[in-house]
């Protein structure tokens, strides 16, 4: 359990998420993320030189990604701060926040910034020399697509793990479609009153199109509404499977930033000094081969145990749900109402840019609890390699 790590209320942002090959498809994720963070600091009147350490969460290689931590720190104005690159697939956000929290807990630094930035669009195509190959043919990898399609240990694609979990927990096509419609309904809640909820945390992203033209993206792009009839008409992705392209997420682009600091500094930086946000605990798990979604529940239970909490103590639950079966399986194991989780949106609906996904979900959970007057937030999500991570925050 952590006791010394705090997040200032509104000391965070998420850009809109754009479906891949959209408006952010050609932007360098680290450069765009750092520049967006710098604009956010300016909007808050924060001095980036006060940041002592930068944690960059990113999973898709970009040019000179090797320098991500210190490079991003310098670009955002924190020129005296070192930085580290964290890549833990889709649980990168949870690990980044936890690592920042551990830095506070151990007294290594007093003020940190977590930048989560990724671009699934136009992923890199890597090649390695192979002199012993036929005619010297290189070893090649499409960074994004090849890793969607094959876990080198479990031996299957991501969608296969979802079907394995669905079969293990006796989940049906009808349940997956029904939950997708519920998640769509919850996302629509965030769009009411001219996106009133999203405007609590969403920060526009600006793209330099030319010397004279700047494109501003203010809202999510590429979210397709679902209907019962539309979902029912879709074929399963795998023969006899329960998931269609409607009941799984899609790759996206975007970035998020979160301040993790001391209680005193969090109060100074907070939009409401009376609304305290504490990083409380962390959990992790690994499921058996090819059962990625099954790791979510035990990781959540570990975070609860570390915090000394029960499910009934939670005020909000947010999950990274790349497949509808994720939430259904988690609900079965932990005795949850799947329909009550993920108010105001989730990655099943607004897309998955990988590293930033969890951060946006955490931010949305904070804002939901702020509206309710406070409570405990659980974020849980699966990650490549049949793993999962969870984090608990106390709001108020």
Question: Where are each of the predicted segments found?
Answer:
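Conserved beta-strand-centric core segments of catalytic alpha/beta enzyme folds
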Residues: 1-39, 95-139, 146-160, 167, ...
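Claisen-condensing/thiolase-fold acyl-transfer catalytic domains that form or cleave C-C bonds
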Residues: 2, 61, 65, 71, ...
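Short amphipathic
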Residues: 7-13, 203-206, 276-285
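N-terminal extracellular/periplasmic Venus flytrap/periplasmic-binding protein-like
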Residues: 14-15, 26, 30-35, 43, ...
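Conserved beta-ketoacyl condensing-enzyme motif
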Residues: 25-98, 103-132, 200-217, 311-334
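Flexible, glycine/charged-enriched surface loops at secondary-structure junctions
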Residues: 47-50, 173-177, 189-204, 272-277, ...
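A short structural micro-motif
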Residues: 57-58, 182-186, 285
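Short, well-ordered beta-strand elements within core beta-sheets of diverse protein domains
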Residues: 162-172, 301-309
């Amino acid at each position: 359990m952590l006791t010394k790590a705090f997040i200032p209320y509104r000391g965070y942002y998420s850009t809109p998420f754009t479906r891949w090959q959209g408006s952010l498809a050609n932007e360098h994720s680290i450069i765009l993320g750092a520049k967006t963070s710098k604009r956010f600091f300016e909007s808050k009147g924060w001095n980036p030189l006060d940041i002592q350490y930068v944690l960059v969460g990113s999973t898709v290689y970009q040019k000179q990604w090797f320098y991500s931590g210190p490079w991003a720190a310098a670009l955002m104005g924190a020129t005296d701060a070192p930085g580290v690159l964290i890549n833990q697939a889709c649980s990168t956000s949870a690990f980044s926040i936890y690592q920042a929290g551990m830095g506070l807990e151990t007294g290594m630094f007093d003020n940190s910034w977590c930048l989560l930035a990724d671009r699934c669009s136009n992923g890199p195509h890597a090649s390695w020399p192979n002199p012993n190959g036929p005619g010297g043919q290189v070893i090649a990898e499409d960074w994004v697509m090849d890793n969607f399609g094959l876990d080198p240990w479990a031996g299957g694609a991501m969608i296969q793990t979802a079907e394995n979990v669905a079969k293990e927990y006796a989940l049906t096509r009808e349940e997956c479609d029904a939950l997708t419609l519920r998640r769509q309904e919850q996302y629509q809640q965030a769009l009411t009153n001219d996106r009133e909820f999203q405007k609590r945390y969403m920060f526009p992203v600006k793209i330099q199109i030319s010397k004279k033209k700047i494109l501003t993206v203010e809202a999510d792009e590429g979210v397709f509404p679902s209907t019962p009839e539309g979902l029912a008409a879709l074929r399963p992705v795998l023969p006899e499977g329960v998931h269609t392209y409607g009941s799984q997420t899609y790759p996206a682009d975007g970035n998020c930033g979160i301040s993790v600091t001391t209680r005193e500094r969090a109060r100074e930086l907070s939009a409401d000094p009376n609304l305290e946000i504490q990083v409380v605990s962390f959990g992790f798990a690994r499921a058996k081969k090819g059962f990625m979604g099954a790791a979510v529940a035990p990781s959540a239970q570990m975070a609860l145990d570390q915090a000394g909490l029960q499910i009934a103590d939670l005020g909000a639950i947010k999950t990274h749900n790349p497949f509808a079966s994720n939430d259904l399986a988690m609900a079965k194991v932990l005795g949850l109402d799947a329909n009550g989780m993920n108010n105001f949106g989730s990655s099943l609906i607004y897309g998955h840019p990988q590293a930033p996904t969890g951060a946006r979900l955490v931010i949305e959970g904070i804002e939901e609890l702020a509206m309710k007057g406070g409570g405990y937030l659980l974020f849980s999500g699966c990650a490549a390699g049949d793993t999962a991570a969870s984090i608990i925050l106390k709001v108020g």
